[in-house]
Amino acid sequence: MAPKAEKKPAAKKPAEEEPAAEKAEKALAGKKPKAEKRLPAGKAEKGSGEGRKAGRKKAKKSVETYKIYIFKVLKQVHPDIGISSKAMSIMNSFINDIFEKLAGESAKLARYNKKPTITSREIQTSVRLVLPGELAKHAVSEGTKAVTKFTSA
């Protein structure tokens, strides 16, 4: 169903402009109005204001990722191999997922033991619970080594 044409209040126009205006209205009556140009999501027109002071640019939201650290580890292990952006995104998601699981498990352990603080002991136990077998043993030994190095330096 086509939208009804908008009715405008009658206003007196000069005699010479009436025929041109009527012709334009008749021509547009059967056609759909042109769609306005849309801006990408999150961007507004410069003149619209949108709660910000005119002339100021919107501050970029900082997004923290593990990409630089993944790349550094890759170069330590395989200096001659690169990584695609899609693979980097997958690795970043993987690390975020593991971090979330470990943090959740550590929080549960602290709650069970009625402790207000998550210590290295809770982290170590959660690593043993979340990661399987040999991987957990290696992760615990590497973590212990890293904490020892951090506290001695």
From Swiss-Prot:
It comes from the Eukaryota. The keyword Glycoprotein does not apply. Residues 1-61 are annotated as: Disordered. InterPro entries: Histone-fold, Histone_H2A/H2B/H3, Histone_H2B, HISTONE_H2B_site. PROSITE patterns: HISTONE_H2B. Keywords: Acetylation, Chromosome, DNA-binding, Isopeptide bond, Nucleosome core, Nucleus, Ubl conjugation. Disulfide bonds: none annotated. The keyword Repeat does not apply. The modification N6-acetyllysine is found at residues 7, 37. GO terms for cellular component: nucleosome; nucleus. Can be acetylated to form H2BK6ac and H2BK33ac. Monoubiquitinated by BRE1 to form H2BK143ub1 and deubiquitinated by UBP26. Required for heterochromatic histone H3 di- and trimethylation at H3K4me. May give a specific tag for epigenetic transcriptional activation. There is a cross-link at residue 149 (Glycyl lysine isopeptide (Lys-Gly) (interchain with G-Cter in ubiquitin)). Residues 1-28, 36-53 have a biased composition (Basic and acidic residues). It is found in: Nucleus; Chromosome. One of its GO terms (molecular function) is DNA binding. The nucleosome is a histone octamer containing two molecules each of H2A, H2B, H3 and H4 assembled in one H3-H4 heterotetramer and two H2A-H2B heterodimers. The octamer wraps approximately 147 bp of DNA. Belongs to the histone H2B family. Core component of nucleosome. Nucleosomes wrap and compact DNA into chromatin, limiting DNA accessibility to the cellular machineries which require DNA as a template. Histones thereby play a central role in transcription regulation, DNA repair, DNA replication and chromosomal stability. DNA accessibility is regulated via a complex set of post-translational modifications of histones, also called histone code, and nucleosome remodeling. This is Histone H2B.3. The lineage of its organism: Eukaryota, Viridiplantae, Streptophyta, Embryophyta, Tracheophyta. The gene is H2B.3.
